[in-house]
């Protein structure tokens, strides 16, 4: 047992450095190509001329597509192992290391050029790769899947500053394939990754800063639960839209570079209306949580961002949709809150409360992982007073979504690439 805890600690350290390496590479490319040192792609887009804002995501997608197509042609005669940690965990626990690194580099290109895709997906993949590489050299084969799971949880903890949510994400998604006794090393890796990440970044701040002054009352629980019902209906719709957009891009029968470039061009066109469509949505979420906009502003940004996310994911841009899903959930919750605020008092507090609820419940509706979704929002914002209400709402959202759409976003992704 001591050996496992020691390895879990090492995996956590490796994962933290993998996440930090990707984050610093991203900041470097943003500084080189966008003259942006703020870390916010929305700020970068705002400061660019319209024509650069239009073309930058398309050029990034084109470069990533050329890289992926070139690698595919170079290795077409070789046997292929998984390049995704979910696939590796469902097979024999092995990665195609070179292809996974190329995929991460392609993700770096589309992320730094403004595509509306999550950077955290590549971070978690690199963390799992680092764990797998270490495990294959120093541990028996039957443990490889455990250490990949530890690496993925640690990467999630370092990326989102949510070690418990990262651990439970692995447990919920892999329920039935991983015994509860294995959760100990996963938690150790996640916590160590968070601590090392805090040391590297010289900060232990929460991911999102929220000023929620409301004390949750009976009325608020009713609103939270109703938001869960709404998210349970919206989750399957979002998954269906993503699947339809992917099929639409595939039906065009474009070469990968042009397909990714088209997705980037759509993001560029949308950014002419609002720069907020650039990036994974983190800075937009923070601005909404700091000062919730008016109903029509939320609606406009939501529609543009939703189209950008669908274009980016549908075109096959390598990256995650975890953080974009958080923004979509926030916007749905805030739209619901603003609408209720027309009749109820404390409209600002209701909007903020239901925005946070929307983040958790839409995440639960798309991942079918309600416990993880609840803990993630609490860990990212520090609003643990919401935990009881969010847990109920997330379970409701997950049940409704699972009833309407059998596959979660991860099962849908696996089926799409199998």
Curated annotation (Swiss-Prot):
Highest taxon listed in the record's lineage: Bacteria
Entry's Gene Ontology cellular component terms: chloride channel complex; plasma membrane
GO MF terms held by the record: voltage-gated chloride channel activity
Cell compartment(s), UniProt: Cell inner membrane
Sequence ranges on the Cytoplasmic membrane side: 1-4, 75-145, 201-221, 279-290, 337-351, 401-418
Pfam families xref list: Voltage_CLC
Record's protein name: Voltage-gated ClC-type chloride channel ClcB
Organism of origin: Escherichia coli O6:H1 (strain CFT073 / ATCC 700928 / UPEC)
């Amino acid at each position: 047992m001591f050996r496992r805890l020691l390895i879990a600690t090492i995996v956590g350290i490796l994962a933290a450095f993998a996440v930090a390496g990707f984050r610093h590479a991203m900041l470097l490319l943003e500084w080189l190509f966008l003259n942006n040192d703020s870390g916010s792609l929305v700020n970068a887009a705002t400061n660019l001329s319209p024509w650069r804002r239009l073309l930058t995501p398309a050029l990034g997608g084109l470069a990533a597509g050329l890289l992926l197509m070139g690698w595919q042609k170079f290795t077409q005669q070789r046997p292929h192992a998984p390049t995704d940690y979910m696939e590796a965990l469902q097979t024999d626990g092995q990665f195609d290391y070179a292809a996974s690194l190329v995929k991460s580099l392609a993700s770096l290109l589309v992320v730094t050029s403004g595509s509306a895709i999550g950077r955290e997906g590549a971070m978690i993949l690199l963390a799992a790769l680092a764990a797998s590489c270490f495990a294959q050299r120093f541990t028996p084969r039957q443990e490889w899947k455990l250490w990949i799971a530890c690496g993925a949880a640690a990467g999630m903890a370092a990326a989102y500053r949510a070690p418990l949510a990262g651990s439970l994400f692995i447990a919920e998604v892999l329920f039935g394939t991983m015994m509860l006794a294995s959760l100990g090393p996963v938690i150790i890796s996640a916590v160590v990754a968070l601590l090392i990440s805090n040391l590297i970044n010289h900060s232990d701040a929460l991911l999102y800063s929220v000023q929620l002054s409301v004390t949750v009352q009976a009325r608020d629980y009713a609103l939270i639960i109703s938001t869960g019902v709404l998210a349970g209906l919206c989750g399957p719709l979002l998954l269906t839209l993503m699947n339809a957009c992917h099929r639409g891009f595939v039906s065009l029968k474009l070469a990968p570079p042009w397909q990714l470039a088209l997705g980037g061009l759509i993001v560029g066109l949308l950014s002419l209306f609002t720069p907020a469509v650039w990036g994974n949505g983190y800075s937009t979420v923070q601005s909404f949580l700091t000062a919730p906009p008016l109903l029509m502003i939320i609606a406009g940004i939501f529609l543009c961002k939703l189209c950008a996310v669908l274009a980016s994911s549908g075109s096959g841009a390598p990256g995650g949709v975890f953080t974009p899903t958080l923004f979509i959930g926030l916007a749905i919750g805030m739209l619901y809150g603003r609408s209720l605020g027309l009749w109820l008092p404390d409209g600002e507090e209701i909007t903020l409360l239901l925005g946070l609820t929307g983040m958790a419940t839409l995440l639960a509706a798309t991942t079918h992982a309600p416990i993880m979704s609840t803990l993630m929002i609490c860990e990212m914002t520090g609003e643990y007073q919401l935990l009881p209400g969010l847990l109920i709402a997330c379970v409701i959202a997950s049940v409704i979504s699972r009833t309407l759409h059998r596959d979660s976003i991860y099962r849908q992704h696996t089926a799409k690439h199998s």
